[in-house]
């Protein structure tokens, strides 16, 4: 297992009818819009409604990206951005966390699910990761995402408490994800 694999800074991918690329400073306004939306941001850590602060965060993130520790993706459908998701906590060899997953409303189930699957495919196939470990977890009241995580092959490992409440922690070995992926692709007609 090569734990030093990295994505190029100009990484892009087209999969399941979506275009994916790494976030840059020009995306700050879109990210702030997503993360500060009261409904969309209900279960995530709060973000200030400050575009300049988000640009600063992205500049710091780009250092982690260059080191292969963090990848923040933006997803497009028909040339318009509609979602973000991340791979992070990659400082432990063979492991990663997927999160910060937010999608604009009004997109199909297939498109939303694809924005969750694609980063995992990148982690397992391109970065040679062996296990996803959700150390920060998913808020226990975010029942749809907890259920979704179980549906794609994640296993509950425990619960942790922070200022926003109780979070369910998960992990998922690569083989469990790939055991479920073909069925998900068939059910959702993802090509």
Where in this protein do the model-derived segments appear?
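Hydrophobic pocket/interface hotspot
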Residues: 31, 98, 149
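Acetyl-CoA-dependent GNAT
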Residues: 52-95
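Conserved catalytic-core motifs of GNAT/GCN5-like acyltransferases
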Residues: 137, 153-170
